[in-house]
Amino acid sequence: MSHKTFSLVFAAVTLSFIAYVAIIQEHSAYAVVVFPDFNFGAAGDWGCTPNATSTVKNMVEKGIELNLGLGDYSYKPSADCWLDIIKPIFNKTKISIGNGDGAAWPEYMNIFNLTRQYYSFDVQNVHFLAMSTQLQNESDKLDQLNFVRNDLNKTSSNPAKDWIVVYFHRQAYTSLLEGGEDRTDIIMRDTYHPLFDKYNVDIVLQAHNHNYQRSYPLNYNEVDPKNPIRVSNETNNYYSDLSGPIFVTVGTGGNGLYKFGVKNDYLVYQTYSSYGFLNVDVINNGTKLSAKFLSNNGTVADQFTIVKSH
């Protein structure tokens, strides 16, 4: 099916399925903004497979309102087969580009109305930043760095934005694969993690390894970058007012899963046993993120909560 049959009605800043409701109390000098609950999902490494179809079905049944694509979609020269699979959630999808998208990346850019491989948008009090791990030209890499720095600086100083979610394809942090392969993207780790710390990023979503991994809240370790600093050692999966982002790998969209080697100490949980997606509910008037990895087999494989008191 040609992508021309699709109609993209997704606005970068204002989403049709989300509304701000302002309640202005009579005789009051203050306006109280009430944020309706909303949710978003994320997955990467899809492929045109029955497993990918099951992931979309899982997302539809959950009723996701936004789908963050973490790269590697059709694994083919054309995007068409993946577009067929995600048709039920196409108008809710915002992508980042992966290495497996290869020669088809200009097609993805055109389909999703992108002028560059990095961009940002807002939904209520949540700021989303999509980045590229596939830029080859040094000038393009510098442009992205400047964009990210300026974007995060602006957002972190905006009192209307309580949450920052960053997403891209290759991982800043990951366990070794079975056999010892290290798929860490050093640029994402050493160049960008310090910025994520500085500007109070809450969650970093990534893929590339075809499995699921979740870290503790982490700060960058200048002395030993391979071993980030655990900001919190909480084991009850409930975090309040974080001072470092949680890195989540969701390479479980549908392409063949990868086994792990040894789990790194900075990871809370990892699994390669099921396909699925990360669902995040933004609730309690935008003050709480409740995240669950929803396996396509109907189980909740992992869950965690982040709350903010301000």
List where the protein language model places each region:
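Secretory targeting signatures
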Residues: 1-31
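N-terminal active-site segment of His-dependent metallophosphoesterases
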Residues: 26-81, 174-175
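A general structural motif
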Residues: 37, 64, 159-163, 288
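Hydrophobic beta-strand anchors of alpha/beta hydrolase catalytic cores
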Residues: 40, 67, 128, 164-165
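Active-site metal-binding loops of divalent metal-dependent hydrolases
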Residues: 43-46, 71-73, 99-100, 133-134, ...
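Conserved beta-strand->loop/alpha-helix structural units within folded catalytic cores of enzymes
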Residues: 67-73, 167-170, 195-209, 282
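Extended active-site neighborhood of metal-dependent phosphoesterases/phosphodiesterases
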Residues: 78-164, 178-192, 197, 203, ...
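A short C-terminal boundary segment appended to hydrolase-like catalytic domains
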Residues: 256-310
